Amino acid sequence: MCELLGICFNKKVNVELSLNSFKHRSEDHPNGWGIAFYPDGFVRVIKEPIKMNEALLAECVRWTKIKSNIFIAHIRKASAGSESYVNTHPFVRKLEDKEIAFAHNGTLLGYEDLELDGYYPIGETDSEYVFCYLLSQIEKREIEWNKEGFDEMLDILLDINYYGAFNCLFSDGEYLFAYKDYRGRRELHFLKRKPPYGRIRLEDEDYIINLGDVKSVREEGFIIATNPLTNEDWKSFENGELMVFKNGEMIYSNKRLTDLELKILKILRESPHRVSLKKIIENLEYLSRNIRHDASVVRIGIRSLLDKGYIKQDSRDTVNWDDLEATFYTKPEKRVEIDKRLKGFRWRRNRIIMS
């Protein structure tokens, strides 16, 4: 099988440390390697149909210390398609004004039943074919990057998953999407990395490093990998789980409460009154030292909490739920569960501002 690596941080970071661990696994994945990143908002792709730990270009990527908020990397053990550049991940296509990079782990059969429209593969792989199908459907359904759009995107991924093992990563340079096979036929893990930073051990080599020596206290974000790369607190995706990350924060999951949602719940629980969307945004900006929250992201969190049944919009409101003046409170029957989930959930700043 192939292996995936995805990175999304709040600031541009150097990928050398994670790539160093990742490349050691290429001995069992000899059919190609590649990396996509967005140093200036536009995608760059470096890939070769050779073993990563024998690739001079891979060493150049490590030592030139390229920086980006988002990275997608892939090492290939071919199950479909020959060893060639066009069959090597990540694949890239333009979707309106977005440049989408995509990588897949798994094997699909009968996927040609999925009808393409406007996007077509150059190579021979199942991966590139279903990437084109994903883009065709996003364009056809006019999917937007919001909670409702992510739900629709999940439906498309589940349709693809019907044809076999399917884990994938894709990004437009602003959002990072990560999906795990609904039958759990491939592993996928994630790590939330945030300060204070300490010593860690790389899983694939006898090497210990103090992250505090190489990381800024302002850096935080998520790393996604097929298998854990370090001895840190990695967690498994749920089967059939889609996660979406932006600016170093998980902003959507169909299987769990995200940190964004927990922050919103904390604001609502610590207020004696209903809280407006505008005030929630202000509090998130005040309470979150490193992560920026624009209104579109906060609306994703609010919509998710409404759909998951944790909060309600006040019946006295005369505006739609997504209006800045809309007000919310936690459902009384959910407050015991919410308080349990918030136990131990801390921010650097603790005082909620309501005036």
UniProtKB/Swiss-Prot annotation:
Transmembrane segments: none
Matches recorded under InterPro entries: EgtC-like (IPR026869), GATase_2_dom (IPR017932), Ntn_hydrolases_N (IPR029055), WH-like_DNA-bd_sf (IPR036388)
Annotated Glutamine amidotransferase type-2 domain residues: 2-248
Pfam families hit by this protein: GATase_4
CDD domains registered for this protein in UniProt: YafJ
Alphabetized UniProt keyword annotations: Glutamine amidotransferase
Active site per UniProt: C2
Disulfide bonds: none
PROSITE patterns, A to Z: GATASE_TYPE_2
PANTHER family listed in its UniProt record: GLUTAMINE AMIDOTRANSFERASE (PTHR42824), GLUTAMINE AMIDOTRANSFERASE YAFJ-RELATED (PTHR42824:SF1)
Protein name: Uncharacterized protein MJ1515
Source organism (scientific name): Methanocaldococcus jannaschii (strain ATCC 43067 / DSM 2661 / JAL-1 / JCM 10045 / NBRC 100440)
